[in-house]
Amino acid sequence: MNHCLIMNIEERSHTRSLGPYRIAHWLRENGWDAEVIDYCAHWSHDELMELCLSRINDNTRFIGFSSLFTGWTNHMEIFSLFLKNYYPNIIQISGSSSLPNADMSAVDYHIYGFGEKALDVLLKYLFSNGEAPRATEYFNTQLIDASHYPAYPLNEYTVLYEERDYLQPWEFLSIETGRGCKFKCSFCNFSVLGVKGDYSTSQDSFEKQLNENYDRWGIKNYVIAEETFNDRTEKVEKFSQVVQRLNFEPWFAAYIRADLLISRKHEVEHLANMNVFGQFYGVESFNQKTSKAIKKGMDRGKMKEGLLKVKEYFEKNNNKYRGNISLIVGAPYETKESLYSSLDWLVDNWKTQSFTAYPLGIPIYGRQSILSGSYSNNEYEEISAEELYQRHDKRYVDKVLKKNNIMKDNKILEKKWLMWKNKQMDVVEAFKIHDHMYDVMRKEKFKKSTFAVAEFSGKESTIDDKLKLDVNAVKTFRDEELQWVEEYKKKKLS
C-alpha cells in the first residue's frame, strides 16, 4: 500500500486544521495509508527526524505540507532540506489556499486551493503513468492551480479520524458543510464565489461525523468550515434537524451573514436550535456608502438595531453565545471619522461580545477580488514604498511591506497586495487605525473573538471557561495548549 505523511505546519499551537485531515481521509478512500502529523511548528528538528525514521518505509511516496496560508518558516525549510538530502526519491508536495513562499527550495509541487482532484491527477502522473498536470514554475516549485481541477461541488466532504490522531474530548474540530459562497462581495477573493443552488453535504454525512467523533473521542465542539453558513434558510433547517436528534449538546461557530439573519423571520431560532452559538458577522462597515460599495447594502441603522436584537435574544436565552462583528479598515469611502464612530458604538453596545478589524487588502496576485480590477473606480491608487517612508515612521512601513509583498533579503520579490492610498487614508494609516482599535479592545476588555474561543484548547478548560475570556486573558490557556502539544509528540513518538 502506498504511504505518505501529511504535516500540519500552521504556526498556531492550538490548531488542528481541517485541510490535512480532509486530504488524508480522501487518500485513504483511494487506497493510501496516510498519517497526519500535527503541530509541526512546535517539533524540534531532532523530533521530526526521529519521527521520519520511525515512519518512512519503502512504500512512502510523498511527504505533504499543509497550511491554510502557507505558513512556511525557516524551521520548516530546514526540515524540508533534510528530507530532500536524506530521502531524495520521496516527493514533497505542499498545499494551501495561498501561493507558495519564495524560500520553499526543496518542495517539488504546490497545490493552490481545494486540492483533492488536483492531487489525484498529480499522484496518477507521478506513480501510475497518468497525464501530467497543468503546472507552472513559481519560484522554486511547480505550482498547480487547483481551479483547473475543481473539487466543488462534491457529494460529501466527510472526514473520519483515526486512533493515531489522538483526538481529545476538549478539542474543537472543523466540519465542512459545503464549499463556495453564493455572494460576490467586492473585496473577497475566495476561490469559489457566486455558487447557484444548494450543494451542501447530506444530513447523513453530517450526522455520521458528529456521532462518531462524540462516541469515539467525546468531542462536542466545532467550527463550521463554510464561507457563509446561513446563505440558505433551508440548509440551516436541514442541519438543525440533525442536531436535535443527537444525544449530546454540541457547540458550533460559523460565518453568519448578518443582513440575512436580521431580515429572515425565524433564522435566529433555527441557529439556536442547531446550537450555532458562535457567530462571526462580516459587517465590514457601519458607513452606508461603504456598505453599498462592497455589496452589503442593508441600512446601517437597521443593521445596528438588528444586531442588538440578536445579541439580546441569545444572551437572554443561553450563556453560550459569542457574537463577533468584523470590520474592514480602509474599505471604499470609509473615513477615519466613520471608523472611530463605529468603534465608539462597539464600546457602548458590544463589550459583552467581541469584534475584529482587518486592514483592507486588495490582492494583485493569485486569485483576485472584484476590487482588484476596479480599485481606481473606487478612488484608490497605488502608492510606492518610497512615498510611504516619507509619510510614516520606518517601523510601520516595514510592517506593511512585509504583509503586502513576498520579501527576501529586505527586497520585494513579488507584490501580493496593492499598497494603496485614497482621499481618506493610505494603507499604513489603515494599519495604525487597526492597531488603535485593538488597543481600545484590550483596554475595554472585549471578549475573545468567536474563532479564538474555538481555537483555545486545553484539557482543563470548558467552553464556559473559554467564553469568559477577554482579549487580555490568554496565558493560562496557552500554557495548557503547549502542554498538550508535548503530550501529543510523546504519543506520536512512542
Which residues are covered by each model-predicted region?
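Structural recognition of alpha->loop->beta junctions
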Residues: 103-121, 270-278, 343-359
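Short beta-strand/loop segments at the ligand-binding rim of alpha/beta enzyme cores
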Residues: 84-94, 249-252, 320-323
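Radical SAM enzyme core and accessory elements
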Residues: 1-9, 28-29, 33, 45-50, ...
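Hydrophobic/aromatic residues located in beta-strands of well-ordered beta-sheets
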Residues: 4, 92, 222, 252, ...
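Acidic, low-complexity intrinsically disordered segments
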Residues: 1-209, 216-218
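Flexible glycine/acidic-rich beta-alpha junction loops that bind and position SAM and/or redox cofactors
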Residues: 98-103, 183, 234, 289-294, ...
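Short, electropositive alpha-helical surface patch
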Residues: 237-244, 334-352
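Radical SAM [4Fe-4S] cluster-binding motif and immediate context
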Residues: 153-319, 329
